[in-house]
Amino acid sequence: MAPHPTLKSTYSTRAETVTHPLSAYLYKLMDLKASNLCLSADVANARELLHVADKVGPSIVVLKTHYDMVAGWDFTPETGTGARLAKLARKHGFLIFEDRKFGDIGNTVELQYTQGAARIIEWAHIVNVNMVPGKASVTSLANAAAKWLERLPYEVKTSVTVGTPRNTDEDDDDEDDGNAGEMERSHTFGLNGNNGVPIKESSDGRKGSIVSVTTVTQQYESAHSPRLTKTIAEEGDMLLAGLEEPPLNRGLLILAQMSSAGNFMNAEYTQACVEAAREHKDFVMGFVSQEALNSQPDDDFIHMTPGCQLPPEHEEDAELRGDGKGQQYNTPEKLIGVCGADIVIVGRGILKAGDLQHEAERYRSAAWKAYTERVR
C-alpha cells in the first residue's frame, strides 16, 4: 500500500492545503523555524516553567504544559502565568499546548475548558481530549471554542465618569447636553447630608438635595485591532522575523494512542478517534499518537508523538531504555521517518540536561533531519 501523500509533503505545502487555520499557521511556523520539536515542560513551579520556556523557546514550535502540576501558578488573566507564557510564545514563536486530557461528559469538559480559575481557552492555543467518554466530549469542546470565538470580534470597553454635584433646584437648562449622544447608561444617586458642598435653601425654606450624575459609557472595539493584536506583549517585544500573529482559532488534539506500556487504547478506540476528528475538522487539528493516522485522501491531520529520546551525545549506538514507570522511548529518526510523526514531544531528555539550549538544539536538529529525509 502506498504511503499517504502527507508523509511525502513538506510542511510548507501542507500549510497551503490544510483547512484548520491554526494547523496552517503551525506548519508555516515549523517551516520558518526549521523545527518540529515540542517541549513537554513538566516542571514543578511557575518560575521554572517560565525560565525553561524562555531558554528553549527559540528551538521549539510547541510548548506542552500541565498547569495543574505547577506550584505558584498565577491565575490573574492579564498578568498571570498563562499571560506570561503567551508573551514568551509571541517573542520566540511557539504555540502553547495545555495537556489537560479532558475526559468527562460534554458539559463538564466544556466548563473545564472555558471557566474556572484557569480559563484554559484564554491562553492555550491547543488542548487535548481523552475520548474514552465518547464523541460528545469532542463535540462539546468544539462548540465551546466556537462560542468563545464568536464573542471575540468586539470587546466592550467601559469608562465611568462622575459629574460635579449640583443642586436639584438649579435650572435644568444650565445642564450640558453635549455628551448625551455618548451616554449608553446613566445612573443618578442622591447624596444625603453635607459633604463639603454648600446647599442652598429654596424659597420655602427647604434644603436642596445634592445629585451626582454618574455616566457609564460603553465603546465597542474590534478584537482584531492593533491594540489586541499586541496581546500581552510589552513595548519592544517583536514577533519572530517573517512570522505573523497566530489566528485566534483554538485547536484540539485527540489522544488516540499512548507510548506507555500496557495502555488500553486499542485499534477500535483509535479508529473512533479518527472518525471524531473527521467530523470536526474545523476544530480538531490532529492526534497525539504513535503513528500517522491519515488514511483517506483528504485527511491532513497533524500527529504529535511523545516518548522521544536521543542517546547521550557521542554515544549514538547506546540502547534506549524506558524510565521504569511505563514510558517507552524511540528516536526521532524512527518516530518521524518510520512511524510518520510530524512533531516529536520531548520532556526529560531536555529538562534533565545541564545545558537546556544546547540539548534542545540537538533534538531539534535530529528531528528536522528525520523529516527532511522522509520528504526527500
Curated annotation (Swiss-Prot):
Entry annotation: catalytic residues: 101
EC number(s) per entry: 4.1.1.23
GO MF annotations, alphabetized: orotidine-5'-phosphate decarboxylase activity
SMART domains for the chain: OMPdecase
Region Disordered, annotated ranges: 160-208
Classification via Gene3D superfamilies: Aldolase class I
Example GO biological process: 'de novo' pyrimidine nucleobase biosynthetic process
Biased composition (Acidic residues): 169-179
Entry GO CC: cytosol
Classification via InterPro entries: Aldolase_TIM (IPR013785), OMPdecase (IPR014732), OMPdecase_AS (IPR018089), OMPdeCOase_dom (IPR001754), RibuloseP-bd_barrel (IPR011060)
Pathway assigned to this chain's UniProt record: Pyrimidine metabolism; UMP biosynthesis via de novo pathway; UMP from orotate: step 2/2
Pfam families linked: OMPdecase
Annotated residues for binding of substrate: 42, 64-66, 99-108, 329, 348
Keyword Plastid: no
Keywords: Decarboxylase, Lyase, Pyrimidine biosynthesis
Catalysed reactions, semicolon-separated: orotidine 5'-phosphate + H(+) = UMP + CO2
PANTHER family from the UniProt entry: OROTIDINE 5'-PHOSPHATE DECARBOXYLASE (PTHR32119:SF2)
Recorded family membership: Belongs to the OMP decarboxylase family.
Protein name per the record: Orotidine 5'-phosphate decarboxylase
Organism expressing this protein natively: Hapsidospora chrysogena
Gene transcribed to yield this protein: PYR4
